[in-house]
Amino acid sequence: MTKPTFFVEEDKILANLFEEGLNNLHLYKPGSSPMYSERLLTLLGEEWSSKTTVHNHFYLKEEYKLRGIHIDDAYTEPPTGYRGNLSRTCHAISELKEAKRNSGYVFLHPVFDSQTNKEETSNFTIEELKEASRQGLIDKKVYALGGINLNNIKQIRDLGFGGVVICGDLWNRFDIHNEFDYKELLVHFTRLKKAIE
């Protein structure tokens, strides 16, 4: 998932992440002008459009031939007439069953305490997650979001999640105001990818 703010060199970093094996980028820029998302998508180019999902400005899905749209809760209806890949975020285990029925995949959030927002703490105990997995609520259609890092990524895999959404653990390795060398970020992405495989 992208940082919530735009920054210089973002398109280059994202293209490199795709080249390193990123298979689905969630373009998450809450409260931003669509013009900036359009610019980023144009800079990324058509090569990565089919691997990009947009969280707002849903018209971008068709205009840039993106993978799909993501709704940031379990209840909001997709745009009228929308036909295409749809994913959404669930904030409670009780939302998973219905959300999975109406979505290609869902995020469960926050699984662990956020690494960037100290006020965002986990909604779930490990026992609750284990029980949800035993009941089949957590499966290949559910991706873990929130506080994912190298220390807990194996636990996510063992719980039966279909994948992970990485945000803070990756972007905290690059200072958008002072750095131009993003090699450490790419190396860390490779470590995360290997840990989940």
Ranges and model annotations:
Residues 104-112, 167:
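Non-cysteine beta-strand/loop elements that form the S-adenosyl-L-methionine
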Residues 75, 112-113:
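Short glycine-rich anion-binding loops that position phosphate/pyrophosphate groups of nucleotides
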Residues 39, 120-130:
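Charged helix-capping and loop-helix junction motifs
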Residues 69, 164-165:
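Paired acidic/hydrophobic, glycine-rich loop segments that form the ligand-binding mouth/hinge
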Residues 113-119, 172-175:
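A short acidic, helix-capping loop that chelates divalent metal ions and anchors anionic groups
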